[in-house]
Amino acid sequence: MSATLRFDNIGKVFPGVRALDGVSFDVNVGQVHGLMGENGAGKSTLLKILGGEYQPDSGRVMIDGNEVRFTSAASSIAAGIAVIHQELQYVPDLTVAENLLLGQLPNSLGWVNKREAKRFVRERLEAMGVALDPNAKLRKLSIAQRQMVEICKALLRNARVIALDEPTSSLSHRETEVLFKLVRDLRADNRAMIYISHRMDEIYELCDACTIFRDGRKIASHPTLEGVSRDTIVSEMVGREISDIYNYSARPLGEVRFAAKAIEGHALAQPASFEVRRGEIVGFFGLVGAGRSELMHLVYGADRKKGGELTLDGKPIKVRSAGEAIRHGIVLCPEDRKEEGIVAMASVSENINISCRRHYLRAGMFLDRKKEAETADRFIKLLKIKTPSRRQKIRFLSGGNQQKAILSRWLAEPDLKVVILDEPTRGIDVGAKHEIYNVIYQLAERGCAIVMISSELPEVLGVSDRIVVMRQGRISGELARQDATEQSVLSLALPQSSTALPGTDAGTETAAQQAA
């Protein structure tokens, strides 16, 4: 089998950080090559070199035995390379069709033929088995749908080499199955593919070979995954053994700290009520579109409620905006870090301290920069945030380190009472997940009421004290930790026509397959 793509001793240095250090491996024709490593290990940097966004400081990229050097995304695309990044790149106010054909819209005498563009896109989407409306604006689509647009864009270019960075991080199971079929079809068509994922199941199901990164270096390359254990890969990734990633231990729970009663909103099929005690972690599980995020946006004041009541420490409160929620000590860590969580052009220190700067004012006017720096340095060390300094722009950090900085923001807030976490470990490696779970436990031990939305069922089962399940815009049930199993949770999450699961392996498999 010939190597279509070869990375030969690739090195890349940023100020204060060696992102890649002598990385070499081959990606063969007709092969899906998995790439694994902790956040900040250098995987995405390598893909940015392949995509022409960065140039290597040393080493060579070779295609079909010839050295290539991409100085722009356009030169990479022209060479038959398609790179789909974890942080999506699209024009929100253009339609699906316009985004898919950006730069190659059919035209006549300088006029874009929109009818022909929509027809072409509709035919190609149907052929790929992707259910997207070519006329829909990207801004109106869910994150999962936007991710499918990015994937389809690469496939429409008929690329020879396709690199996917966490492509399923926001996809439902059905969308993931569509993607897997596309990848298998491309492999059969002799394309060469790189597949980055933190989901071990996907690597074993889809990949023919796998390379492991750690701290910018290639630690191992496995030409086949047969006989390679998951423990081996985890140990190669993190440099240590993680016996229990969740590290859960029971803690005493206090009185009800936060309660939502009969919350109504446009995305909910019926009023929703729940409560969370001091020190309690309540996991919210459901399929994509079940209404979990929508409910929390109503509670947080990000979306307008049609009705309902909120109480905090037994007293009624009004929350009509995110600012009002924060003043009550209620915070939301959003699913979409890039759009809603980080201030991309600000430093790591500024992002950590953004919510608690009012505590650093001297004489009510002057910011105590020393205290701000001390707080940032403390949490960078505590959460092992990989950054050359607190002054580094947060946009240059990996997704996992950005997430840790966002969590630090709330750990630094002394008046915190309620924390809502929406997919807190999406796109994050196993080592960073372990650290983030410890942060969640620290918040709970402080007496915070924690709500954790997650589409990863093992995570919900492993971290939560209690699990609330949503289905089709309503709360379908709740389970205590000791009563919760994969099957009992899924039976509450699936549409009612599919809930007759108990006792059959086939039923359990069907349930698992439909879970996000």
Swiss-Prot record:
The protein, known as: Arabinose import ATP-binding protein AraG
Species assigned in the record: Paraburkholderia xenovorans (strain LB400)
Function: Part of the ABC transporter complex AraFGH involved in arabinose import. Responsible for energy coupling to the transport system.
Name of one Pfam family that matches: ABC_tran
Primary localization: membrane
Catalytic activity reported: L-arabinose(out) + ATP + H2O = L-arabinose(in) + ADP + phosphate + H(+)
Highest taxon of source: Bacteria
Topology in the lipid bilayer: Peripheral membrane protein
